[in-house]
A protein has these predicted regions:
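Positively charged n-region of N-terminal signal peptides that target proteins for export
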Residues: 1-7, 12
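Second-shell loop/turn segments in exported
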Residues: 28-32, 80-95, 104-114, 143-148, ...
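Peptidyl-prolyl cis-trans isomerase
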Residues: 220-280, 321
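N-terminal targeting/tethering segments
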Residues: 23-143
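PPIase-associated folding chaperone regions across multiple families
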Residues: 25, 32, 138-216, 273-366
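C-terminal motif of bacterial Sec signal peptides marking the signal peptidase cleavage site
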Residues: 16-20
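A short, compositionally biased
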Residues: 21-27, 242, 292
Length: 366
């Protein structure tokens, strides 16, 4: 009997000791300045940092094998050749992400920012869409809907900060003169037609000879626009439309297809968007160097070309109508740097023991 009782006591003691060793997920991992970091936001920052590392993986590295990949080395700067172990890179980027989140929220509050009900609804709606699409991955990494909603609000606050800092009545407003100069020298308003370099029925791609033939026909249409004497933007766009409607049937016929009923499109592009859209060699510079009222035809990607006309943006919209877009193009990089510096200056009260309960080795990357 004594032996059985002793065994029972030992078993109970073991259960108690094991219960005392259960590792629970912390609610927070500490703070940066006065900004408390939830465990969910920490896991999101860490997962995003891992994805950045995965994007830098070489062809012979498998980011899906998390434990192995964390021990490997990646090139983090192709220009300088700087390298880092993945685990160190993920740790650094996780902290940088958290600092940016904290800086965004703190600066937003300092400047009296307030999300509108519409913005909050937008954040919640997009967060739900992300969970619908990627919920299994998020949940596997400890990231729930509430965290994604929080993150979407941070993104909206970051966007609103552009107005709170640089807009009319902002902390350091940009003058109309500076906005106009940036608009005229760094942004491009286009009226354009996109022409696919494939048969729209069979999806057979054009060969080099067919591309050259299609581009020649489109350039002839651009020349017709440039030879017309049109003063106003509306007259210039009308000339583009007329030239396009005359040329498109022959252009599409090269591939045995017919044009759709697409009307002329218009868009104001910033410099970075121009470069990321016009990826074929020289195409971005061709568009950037157009004078107001001048047209050109370029192959802008591997699958499409464009018949485009540059228009004076202030002839179709007022500066007030374009203010937010110009500020975004002009000041996004500056704001990003300012938030990074602000975040790095915050006192670090992150709890190492809490973060150790959320190790990067537990990341699921399928």
């Amino acid at each position: 009997m004594k032996q059985k009782l002793l065994a029972l006591v030992c078993a109970l003691a073991l259960v108690v000791s094991l219960a005392g060793c259960v590792i629970s997920t912390p609610d927070t991992v500490g703070s940066l300045g006065d900004y408390e970091i939830s465990s969910g936001l920490y896991l999101l920052a860490q997962y995003d940092a891992y994805q950045k590392a995965a994007d830098l993986a070489s062809s012979d590295q498998d980011a899906a094998n998390v434990n192995a990949f964390l021990k490997q080395t990646i090139t983090v700067d192709s220009d300088s050749g700087e390298t880092a172990t993945v685990s160190d890179y993920v740790a650094r980027k996780t902290l940088e992400n958290l600092q940016t989140y904290a800086a965004t929220e703190l600066r937003f509050d300092e400047l009296g920012g307030q999300l509108t009900a519409e913005e909050e609804q937008q954040a919640d709606s997009y967060a739900q869409q992300l969970m619908d699409q990627y919920g299994d991955t998020y949940k596997a990494n400890g990231i729930g809907l509430e965290t994604v909603q929080h993150f979407e609000r941070i993104l909206l606050k970051s966007n609103d900060l552009l107005t709170l800092v640089y807009g009319n009545g902002g902390e350091t407003p940009v003058s109309d003169a500076d906005l106009t100069e940036h608009l005229e020298n760094n942004m491009v308003e286009l009226a354009y037609y996109v022409i696919p370099l494939y048969n729209t029925s069979t999806y057979a791609f054009a060969d080099d000879d067919q591309k050259a033939q299609m581009l020649t026909l489109a350039q002839q249409a651009a020349t017709a626009v440039n030879l017309a004497s049109n003063e106003s933007a509306s007259e210039q766009v009308s000339a583009l439309n007329a030239a396009a409607q005359a040329a498109l049937p022959d252009i599409y016929a090269v591939l045995g297809s017919t044009p759709s009923d697409t009307n002329v499109q218009t868009e104001l592009l910033g410099s970075s968007t121009l470069d990321s859209t016009f990826t074929q060699s020289g195409s971005a510079d061709t568009i950037r160097n157009l004078a107001y009222g001048q047209a050109a035809a370029v192959q802008y990607s591997s699958y499409a070309m464009m018949l485009a006309l540059r228009v004076d943006p202030l002839s179709v919209s007022s500066l007030d109508d374009l203010r937010d877009q110009v500020i975004t193009d002009m000041k996004t990089s500056e704001l990003k740097t300012a938030l990074s510096d602000y975040g790095a200056s915050l006192e670090n009260h992150l709890d190492t023991s809490a973060m150790n309960k959320l190790p990067m080795t537990k990341i699921v990357n399928k």
